[in-house]
Design a protein with these regions (language model features):
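Short, conserved beta-strand element in jelly-roll/cupin
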Residues: 111-128, 201-205
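Short, solvent-exposed loop/turn segments at secondary-structure junctions
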Residues: 26-29, 90-92, 107, 126-128, ...
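Short, surface-exposed loop/helix-turn segments at secondary-structure junctions
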Residues: 103-104, 153-162, 195, 214-220
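Non-heme Fe(II)-dependent double-stranded beta-helix
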Residues: 1-111
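Generic beta-strand structural signal
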Residues: 85-87, 98-100, 115-121, 131, ...
Length: 293
């Protein structure tokens, strides 16, 4: 297994548990990022908002450049031989009343060879009232699957079961949740009058090729991708100018270590149309399942 973190103990925990929480930004850096956000945004933010979803590419880059500059030293200190991809502000306001359901982030590398990660850093202290993150330790080892636009979420029907078994991370401003993109995670709604402002940043091993996985009926098309595509393209619309390198016909969901509260046989036998209906009803925020969550 590739070493991701410079600290061997933390690296082992990341590998076995799927995540670690570490001190990451000094208070002055937290204030810098928070002030920069409010300097460039109105106070009223509707629902869930991410700068990476802006249609203004120059604005996306401006937000990314600031986050990257502030994160740079901490990334150098914590990560071993990794490539820093890009960052986004992710903000929850009181008007987003529903929770973000349990989910995994998209595949962006060949997970049979490499792993990919997010660095998620709140700029305010978190609790259950203002949008704290929840995780399922070791859930990154549950299944081998493909995740991306137009690819059904086969475990979506078990959202409530998964939620009941999650652990809440009441993080402090400036701490970082470093997690494997395969890890099941979710978050509470923000019930307070203050915005829950956070930042997220993608990381992959230096030698890993980026890929974009796009569902096509019963198949999954695989395209060579890049940081520029995720930063500048409209990744919801499809591969656009990317080079297709493979088509995986009728990809299977492979069980590795599912817990007892998820019936694997039921998952495999659920009709695809039923899976899509569950996604529409319970995960209207499914478009968030990307590198910049």
């Amino acid at each position: 297994m590739q070493q991701i973190l410079t600290n061997i103990v933390l690296d082992k925990t990341l590998s076995t548990e799927g995540y670690v929480v570490v001190p990451f930004l000094e208070e002055s850096h937290v204030n810098t990022l928070r002030d920069f956000f409010f300097e460039n945004h109105a106070k009223d933010i509707p629902g869930f908002y991410a700068t990476a979803h802006s249609t203004d590419i120059a604005f996306r880059k401006k937000m990314n450049d600031k986050i990257k500059a502030v994160f740079e030293n901490s990334i150098t200190n914590y990560f071993h031989n990794c490539l820093a991809l890009g960052g986004s502000y992710v903000v929850k306001s009181k008007s987003q009343e529903e929770r973000l359901h349990p989910h995994q982030d998209w595949n962006i590398v060949d997970e049979s060879k490499h792993r990919s990660f997010n660095i998620w850093v709140p700029l305010v202290d978190l609790n259950e009232n203002n949008g704290a993150i929840r995780v399922v330790p070791r859930s990154h080892l549950w299944v081998d699957n493909y995740r991306g636009p137009n690819i059904p979420d086969y475990l979506g029907a078990f959202n409530e079961n998964i939620w009941q078994h999650m652990q809440t991370l009441n993080m402090k401003a400036g701490e970082a949740l470093i997690y494997d993109h395969r890890l099941f995670h979710a978050s509470y709604p923000n019930k307070t009058d203050e915005l829950r402002v956070a930042t997220v940043f993608g990381i992959i091993p230096q030698e890993a090729q980026m890929y974009y996985y796009f569902g096509d009926g019963d198949a999954v098309n695989v395209y060579e991708s890049s940081v520029d595509f995720f930063m500048e393209g409209n990744i919801q619309k499809g591969p656009e100018v990317l080079k297709k390198v493979n088509t995986i016909s009728a990809p299977t969901l492979t069980k590795r270590a599912l817990p007892d509260y998820i019936n694997f046989q039921e998952v495999k036998e659920t009709p695809i149309e039923e899976i899509k209906q569950v996604e529409e009803k319970t995960n209207r925020l499914g478009w968030l399942k990307k590198i910049f969550r």
